[in-house]
Amino acid sequence: MPPPPRLLFLLVMLLVVAAPGAPVFGANAPPEVKAEIDALLMFRSGLRDPYAAMSGWNASSPSAPCSWRGVACAAGTGRVVELALPKLRLSGAISPALSSLVYLEKLSLRSNSLSGTIPASLSRISSLRAVYLQYNSLSGPIPQSFLANLTNLQTFDVSGNLLSGPVPVSFPPSLKYLDLSSNAFSGTIPANVSASATSLQFLNLSFNRLRGTVPASLGTLQDLHYLWLDGNLLEGTIPSALSNCSALLHLSLQGNALRGILPPAVAAIPSLQILSVSRNRLTGAIPAAAFGGVGNSSLRIVQVGGNAFSQVDVPVSLGKDLQVVDLRANKLAGPFPSWLAGAGGLTVLDLSGNAFTGEVPPAVGQLTALQELRLGGNAFTGTVPAEIGRCGALQVLDLEDNRFSGEVPAALGGLRRLREVYLGGNSFSGQIPASLGNLSWLEALSTPGNRLTGDLPSELFVLGNLTFLDLSDNKLAGEIPPSIGNLAALQSLNLSGNSFSGRIPSNIGNLLNLRVLDLSGQKNLSGNLPAELFGLPQLQYVSLAGNSFSGDVPEGFSSLWSLRHLNLSVNSFTGSMPATYGYLPSLQVLSASHNRICGELPVELANCSNLTVLDLRSNQLTGPIPGDFARLGELEELDLSHNQLSRKIPPEISNCSSLVTLKLDDNHLGGEIPASLSNLSKLQTLDLSSNNLTGSIPASLAQIPGMLSLNVSQNELSGEIPAMLGSRFGTPSVFASNPNLCGPPLENECSAYRQHRRRQRLQRLALLIGVVAATVLLLVLFCCCCVYSLLRWRRRFIEKRDGVKKRRRSPGRGSGSSGTSTDSVSQPKLIMFNSRITYADTVEATRQFDEENVLSRGRHGLVFKACYNDGTVLAILRLPSTSSDGAVVIEEGSFRKEAESLGKVKHRNLTVLRGYYAGPPPDVRLLVYDYMPNGNLATLLQEASHQDGHILNWPMRHLIALGVSRGLAFLHQSGVVHGDVKPQNILFDADFEPHLSDFGLEPMVVTAGAAAAAAAASTSATTTVGSLGYVAPDAAAAGQATREGDVYSFGIVLLELLTGRRPGMFAGEDEDIVKWVKRQLQRGAVAELLEPGLLELDPESSEWEEFLLGIKVGLLCTAPDPLDRPAMGDVVFMLEGCRVGPDIPSSADPTSQPSPA
């Protein structure tokens, strides 16, 4: 039965009356409302709105602006009273038009990216009660009268901006909350704050640049609850007048330069709960009132650390609410303050960094609520009381750097909540208690610098939450147990300075979160390093120094892209230094001294642009010092001493402008000391002794301002020691054992040296005269022989003419050979970096560049297969000589320079230039590369599609993507932009290792016309900056190749590799491979993305997750905005993270994978 009409009418009316909906004006909105709409739209027009939060602000809406997001209106009038748009990443400036919102009461734009100044016109909105502009990038000063004009303002928060200038001096009486913290305000704190802001309850001026003193007038703010002035430059004393702030709850003055005492009256404010005056220069005694008791029973937290307090006034009683007592880093002495044991509710006690002595009393066990006990950096002695085991709530125990002795208390194993234990720098002995294995929440265990003995207890290796383990500098022995691999959360492992022996267990490869590994100074660790060590992707610090490791210098470290510190010193490593270490972009310290490393210094180390220390002393290195080391602009220490290096010191080394230490002593270096070394303005130590250096000492070395140590002894230097160097380094041993060197501080007088030089010149002159005389004599003899021969020939001619018979010479006697000798004019040779091949050999190997030998046609010319008589197979790129538009190859000198530069770009995933040829004929330009027998990725994907894709399983696709990303990342790191990343330019060697090709060739052709002619026959159309379907829209529009464009092209290749869909399969402007992938993900049709060879992936398996991660990496790389695309180094990191299981080796042949039945 339906309700009666009257009841329905009443219900409708009730709803209408009760609904507080916004007024509906439509086109009949009053002028003042239209003005507010215009002001809001003008405000919106000046902002960038990435979340489109204001997209619904439509002036034609009947309920505008009251229905707009972030806008609230007064009921009935429709006037805007609130504008709240927090946390929306809005950027731009705040429009002064907001001053038209005359009824605005609340303005909240906090946590955005707003910039510019605070509009002064906002001060005309007298109705404003609250302004929230914190956590933006606003700058400039606050106008002095700004706050005073806002007569109804109660809350003003602009913390976390870039505001500067002085703090305003006048405030409205209504102001209760003022937060100007974390800006750049300067000047002093206005003394008249209390005169105008009489109702102030919260005042935060922390983390600015305020100077001067704390105004005593702040003591008149009777309603003040919070006073925070931390992190400024305040001086003077703490005014006792602050004790008049009877409502004060929290006083924080940390991180200033306040002096004098802590006034007892301030500590005794009855309402005070938190007292923080740490990191100042306060002296005297800590007043008893600071610990609660009769004077102040409300105190909960007392922080007075980092001052110069020398004593503590012991309170008669302790506050019942006392929870935190921080007395660290003062000058307190005497025994442990046992009276603190009466604070039963104490949770944090920090006495570290003082001069307390004696034993820790058993009474510490009464602090049953204690969570943190920090006693480090004192002089406590004796044993740790077993009663500490009663502190069942303890989470942090710090006893470092004291004089504790005895065994580590087994009672610690009963403190099940312990997270951090620091026992280093004491004299603990005995074994590590097995009971520590009960601490299932333990995250950090540190016991360095004690006298602990025995093996590592197996119970330690069940601590699944342990992230930090430091047992260094003890007397622990035995082997490192394989169970160490159970510590899956471990990030830092330091076992250095012990007596462990045996090998590093392979289970260390399970520590995938490990960042620091220090096993140095064991002496008895030996054998080869486990390969699993090189699979720890987050490893940043490795020190294996001072052991007995052997074998070749491990090349596996080159796979650890995050590695910053590598120390292999004092071992028995042999072989050469791996060139692949030059591919470690983050490497800062490389030390491999005191080994048996031989061979030449790899020039690739110059690619480590962040390297600060290179220490390879005391090895068997030979050859020259690479001039490319000049690119190491951050290098501070270079020590190559005690090797067998030869040739000259490269003058380019002076480009290492950060060098502090340069040691090249005890080598076979020759030539002169480069005068350019004087450009090393930061150099402090220079040791060139025990070499074969010649010439004079450059006087400019004296211009190095901070040089403290110099040694050029035991060379073959000559001439006079520069006077400034002689007086600066007055020890004769600095210049000793140079027979031809003279002048102070040596005893060799330069006058005697000059006489010796004069005798040498006379001897040389006499020798020269002798040589000239002998030459003249030989010339006279030669002329006489010629005259004699001429006269004899004339006589024979006359005799023959007169008919005189002569005996005929017997055939062959005295006659020359009748045959013509072949002129062995050498054939023109290709400039090969590692072999000798002539141009004629290459013409024969390519059958005179026959079409049948063409491997590919690219935008830079034709690639020929060259099969040489000795079985060598190479790929020859022949650059076009001319084109339809008249473009020609660059002249020979420039071509050679570009080719030499390109030949230095080496990476395992790039096609490396092996040689070049620059004529004759004059228009021939050839580039020589390794032959890639397994074709390119485009062909491989096409074959995969014809065989249901089974020849390309997921691990192989991942390895291809990872290899290409590494090669492209190395190109970008070397300053090279590829410009045409596509499957046709990804080649495979005999081991199916991917190599990125066709890069760095643009400078070798004057214009693009020559490339265009050859590219016309390419399988995919090519633009000036890439290939259609792969080129980034922004790069195509700009007509210029960029790193961001390369990332986009790589993303397209990655999506094609994973899905099997070519970009050319999508027709029309509204569809491409990126949009297609996104649409499948939005539909949840992930199976549609799978290439046929990946259809057997189990959705519950890790490989399924890895595949999805790879898809997401591809979408990140193809972001529409170039600024949103990751760098290739980040792409490598993400792709390395895609494989959570073991990878197949990169040499695996994908065609050997059988197709499933």
Curated annotation (Swiss-Prot):
InterPro entries in alphabetical order: Kinase-like_dom_sf (IPR011009), Leu-rich_rpt (IPR001611), Leu-rich_rpt_typical-subtyp (IPR003591), LRR_dom_sf (IPR032675), LRR_N_plant-typ (IPR013210), LRR_R13L4/SHOC2-like (IPR055414), Plant_LRR-RLKs (IPR050647), Prot_kinase_dom (IPR000719)
SUPFAM superfamilies: L domain-like, Protein kinase-like (PK-like), RNI-like
Signal peptide: 1-21
Knockout consequences: Dwarf plants with erect leaves. Reduced organ sizes due to decreased cell numbers resulting from reduced cell division rate.
One Gene Ontology cellular component: plasma membrane
Primary localization class, coarse: membrane
UniProt keyword annotation of ATP-binding present: yes
LRR repeats: from-to residues: 101-125, 127-149, 150-172, 173-196, 198-220, 221-245, 247-269, 270-293, 296-319, 320-343, 344-367, 368-391, 393-414, 415-439, 440-463, 464-487, 489-511, 513-536, 537-559, 561-583, 584-608, 609-631, 632-656, 658-680, 681-704, 706-728
Pfam family, one: LRR_1
Segments for region (Disordered): 804-825
Glycosylation site list: 58, 149, 192, 204, 244, 296, 438, 465, 494, 524, 567, 607, 610, 655, 679, 692, 711
Compartments where located: Cell membrane
BP terms from Gene Ontology: brassinosteroid mediated signaling pathway; post-embryonic plant organ development
Transmembrane segments: 765-785
Domain Protein kinase residue range list: 849-1144
Binding site for ATP: 855-863, 930-932, 936-939, 980-985, 998
Membrane topology value: Single-pass type I membrane protein
Domain note: The protein kinase domain is predicted to be catalytically inactive.
Biological function: Functions in the early stages of organ development by regulating cell division rate. Is probably involved in the regulation of a number of cell-cycle genes. May act as regulator of brassinosteroid (BR) signaling and cell-cycle controlling organ growth.
Assigned protein family: Belongs to the protein kinase superfamily. Ser/Thr protein kinase family.
Something else known: Xiao means small in Chinese.
Protein name stated in the entry: Probable inactive leucine-rich repeat receptor kinase XIAO
Species in which this protein is naturally found: Oryza sativa subsp. japonica
Taxonomic path: Eukaryota, Viridiplantae, Streptophyta, Embryophyta, Tracheophyta
